[in-house]
């Protein structure tokens, strides 16, 4: 009421007390009031709110101070109790064999002072444990199998474009410069090579790989008067006379028995037997003269192509 007097508002004594008042939570609510109530209500509520906030702030600050003091005093106690709990848990886990997975086991060869990422990297460099005898035998058998597979693969690969090879070539072309490559002499199991193949390379020397096809050939080089041996070109020169017609005397000497004994059975002959027989007979007819072979006799030509 003193504040109302200071504001200069005069109120009679009969109307100074409110008609009805309600007391609730330390605050007074005026239900009926005469005069300017707006300023009074605002001032009343502002004062009531200030009184409510102050004890809450004081209590919260005192509570936080107590917490900080308690934490400062009991800090060491909580740390020691926490470490003791961890040790107890680890000891209980190690006692139980079923709970060993929960205990972190340090890897062998790792340093405790190393960070976790370096420990992970160093674990890759640890030497592997020694393998058991069974594992060693398995690994050795696998290695041997791999080597055998490599060897078989290298042997199965065709080194030459020749079709149907009978046997591998045992002679290397690098060791001998005059060696003819195996691709020039393909071997067929059902027939013998005709001498036309060797006529392509007159300057090359015949090698032992060629004569396993012709068993009647002899690897005897020419012997010169001074004693030195010459190349095997005289055999190639004998084959050059096969392109010319034969004499009747030479054809008589070429009997079927001699042909079968020197060059194999006649069942393996190609579909053109006349030409092939003429080539075989030419091997034994090395003494025929060129003048008689070149004579234009129709009878001789007929006999040369028909037996």
Curated annotation (Swiss-Prot):
Family annotation (PANTHER family): TRANSCRIPTION COFACTOR VESTIGIAL-LIKE PROTEIN, TRANSCRIPTION COFACTOR VESTIGIAL-LIKE PROTEIN 1
Localization: Nucleus
Purpose: May act as a specific coactivator for the mammalian TEFs.
Superkingdom of source: Eukaryota
Family: Belongs to the vestigial family.
A single cellular component GO annotation: nucleus
Annotated spans, Disordered: 55-121, 287-307
Chief place where the protein resides: nucleus
Skewed-composition ranges (Basic residues): 297-307
Biased segments, Basic and acidic residues type: 76-90, 98-110
Stated name of the protein: Transcription cofactor vestigial-like protein 1
Segments of skewed composition (Polar residues): 58-75, 111-121
The protein's assembly and partners: Interacts with TEFs.
Keyword Transcription regulation: yes
InterPro entries listed in its UniProt record: Vg_fam
Keyword terms, alphabetized: Nucleus, Transcription, Transcription regulation
A Gene Ontology biological process term: regulation of DNA-templated transcription
């Amino acid at each position: 009421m003193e504040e109302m007097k200071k504001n200069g508002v005069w109120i009679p004594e009969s109307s100074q007390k409110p008609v009805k008042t309600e007391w609730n939570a330390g605050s007074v609510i005026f239900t009926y009031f005469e005069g300017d109530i707006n300023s009074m209500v605002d001032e009343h509520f502002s004062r009531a709110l200030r009184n409510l906030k102050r004890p809450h702030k004081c209590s919260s600050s005192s509570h936080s101070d107590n917490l900080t003091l308690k934490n400062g005093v009991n800090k060491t106690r909580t740390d020691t109790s926490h470490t003791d709990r961890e040790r107890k848990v680890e000891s209980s886990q190690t006692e139980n064999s079923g709970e060993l997975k929960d205990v972190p086991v340090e890897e062998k060869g790792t340093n405790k002072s190393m960070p976790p990422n370096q420990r992970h990297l160093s674990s890759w460099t640890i030497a592997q444990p020694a393998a058991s005898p069974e594992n060693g035998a398995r690994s050795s058998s696998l290695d041997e199998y791999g080597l055998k597979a490599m060897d078989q693969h290298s042997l199965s690969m065709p080194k030459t474009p020749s079709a149907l090879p009978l046997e591998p070539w045992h002679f290397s072309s690098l060791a001998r410069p005059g060696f003819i490559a195996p691709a020039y002499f393909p071997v067929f199991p059902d027939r013998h090579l005709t001498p036309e193949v060797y006529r392509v390379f007159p300057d090359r020397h015949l090698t032992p790989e060629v004569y396993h096809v012709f068993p009647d050939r002899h690897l005897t080089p020419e012997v010169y008067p001074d004693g030195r041996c010459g190349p095997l070109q005289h055999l190639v020169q004998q084959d050059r006379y096969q392109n010319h017609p034969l004499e009747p005397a030479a054809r008589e000497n070429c009997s079927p028995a001699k042909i079968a004994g020197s060059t194999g059975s006649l069942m393996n002959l190609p579909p053109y037997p006349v030409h092939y027989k003429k080539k075989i007979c030419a091997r034994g007819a090395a003494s025929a003269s060129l003048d008689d072979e070149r004579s234009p006799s129709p009878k001789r030509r007929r006999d040369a192509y028909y037996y």
